[in-house]
Amino acid sequence: MIDAEKNNSPLDLSYLRDMSGDSAEFMIEMIDMFKLQTPLYIADLEQSIVAQEWDKAAGFAHKIKPTLSYVGREDARGHLQLIENSARDLKDLSDMPKNFQEFSDFVQILYRQLDEAKAELEKRL
């Protein structure tokens, strides 16, 4: 589940750091790509939930999950796993709108954290 304490901490970008050989330029590109693609994936997830297309919802949640690990928010990955499992197994579907809204609200916090991380990385260029 989403760990609210991590919302006010700097992101753990160790995965990106390792993957990029500590290249600030590459990490900035990955952050920019995340911020460009994620809203599209989230919109697809929301549309599938509203339309009650549970197979699609499970697929979109699954697609977003790994990207959260890249930016150091493994905790939110667990929240998406809950959404994916509920959609795939057709369980607790009445909780789906609430669970989606919690994730959507979290993403706004994550974007702020990514902006802060990017600003720190830009100092290294």
Residue spans for each PLM region:
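Active-site flanking loop/helix segments enriched in acidic
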Residues: 18, 22-26
